């Protein structure tokens, strides 16, 4: 039994070794065949790539030649020594002056010195400028057109002022600084200035100081309703009185206004007041000239 077991062990070991050797041999054989095929495949691929490169190179040369052949007619401007000696088409050089430069420029853009898009871009850039200037000029003309119409409307305004054929000139006799004028003192001053109590319960200055003739100007109370009561003047007081005259009036309007101004100044002196203009401001020489100008305007308006 021991011998049989030993024999089986030896046979098994030999079988295992044989299998290992056979596996190593087959693996080496496959590797050697792979390495042998790889150089062949690489050479074949290199040849195919080289062949494809040659075909592409030939195509490129053809395209370059075609592009090089196209601008040959434009080489007539160059010197004969600059033309390449390889091309046989450089022989018809003496025949080049016959065709004009303008004719081929429309058919083939290679004959012209400038690219076709550059020549087309020029009119396109100038065309939009013209409508812009026209659009800008139109509103400018529209804005300036109505300008002369404004003074035409304002011109008739000064003509309406001389049309006044009558006016009222007013003077005020006022107490000082918020004071009041006593009724008795006022009555004495008014009577001494030639006024007479009359219509509308106010005082009037007639052409005749005695109270006869047309009325030249009148005197009223500064406080509404502007009337007086001569019987109660002792109990009466007022901040001031107003003297007014209509223009045109009887006689000379300038002399009547001068008389009215003198009467106002006399009453102011009697009652201790001051003479004010129609705006209740202190009388000034400039304001007197304004009164005289108003009188002249009314006289001129009535004379026409």
Curated annotation (Swiss-Prot):
Residues 31-165 are annotated as: Disordered. It comes from the Bacteria. Its main location: membrane. It is found in: Cell inner membrane. The keyword Endoplasmic reticulum does not apply. One of its GO terms (cellular component) is plasma membrane. Residues 1-5 are periplasmic. The chain crosses the membrane at residues 6-26. It is a single-pass type I membrane protein. SUPFAM superfamilies: Cell-division protein ZipA, C-terminal domain (SSF64383). One of its GO terms (biological process) is division septum assembly. Residues 27-304 are cytoplasmic. Residues 137-158 have a biased composition (Low complexity). It holds the Pfam family ZipA_C. Residues 121-132 have a biased composition (Basic and acidic residues). Keywords: Cell cycle, Cell division, Cell inner membrane, Cell membrane, Membrane, Transmembrane, Transmembrane helix. Belongs to the ZipA family. Essential cell division protein that stabilizes the FtsZ protofilaments by cross-linking them and that serves as a cytoplasmic membrane anchor for the Z ring. Also required for the recruitment to the septal ring of downstream cell division proteins. Interacts with FtsZ via their C-terminal domains. This is Cell division protein ZipA. It comes from Erwinia tasmaniensis (strain DSM 17950 / CFBP 7177 / CIP 109463 / NCPPB 4357 / Et1/99).
């Amino acid at each position: 039994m021991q011998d049989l077991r030993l024999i089986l062990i030896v046979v098994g070991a030999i079988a295992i070794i044989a299998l290992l050797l056979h596996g190593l041999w087959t693996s080496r054989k496959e590797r050697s065949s792979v390495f042998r095929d790889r150089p062949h495949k690489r050479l074949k691929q290199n040849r195919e790539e080289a062949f494809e490169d040659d075909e592409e190179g030939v195509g490129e040369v053809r395209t370059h030649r075609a592009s090089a052949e196209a601008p040959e007619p434009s080489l007539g401007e160059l010197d004969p020594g600059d033309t390449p000696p390889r091309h046989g088409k450089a022989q018809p050089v003496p025949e080049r002056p016959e065709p004009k430069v303008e004719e081929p420029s429309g058919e083939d853009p290679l004959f012209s010195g400038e690219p076709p898009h550059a020549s087309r871009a020029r009119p396109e850039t100038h065309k939009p400028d013209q409508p812009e200037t026209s659009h800008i000029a139109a509103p400018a003309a529209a804005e300036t057109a109505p300008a002369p119409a404004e003074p035409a409307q304002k011109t008739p305004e000064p003509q309406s002022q001389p049309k006044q054929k009558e006016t009222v000139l007013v003077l005020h006799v006022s107490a000082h600084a918020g004071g009041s004028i006593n009724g008795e003192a006022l009555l004495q001053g008014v009577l001494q200035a030639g006024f007479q109590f009359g219509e509308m319960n106010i005082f009037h200055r007639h052409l005749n100081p005695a109270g006869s003739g047309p009325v030249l100007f009148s005197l009223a109370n500064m406080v509404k309703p502007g009337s007086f009561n001569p019987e109660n003047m002792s109990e009466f007081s007022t901040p001031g009185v107003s003297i007014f005259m209509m223009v045109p009036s009887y006689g000379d309007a300038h002399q009547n206004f001068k008389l009215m101004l003198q009467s106002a100044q006399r009453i102011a002196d009697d009652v201790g007041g001051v003479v004010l203009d129609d705006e209740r401001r202190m009388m000034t020489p400039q304001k007197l000239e304004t009164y005289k100008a108003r009188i002249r305007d009314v006289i001129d308006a009535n004379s026409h």
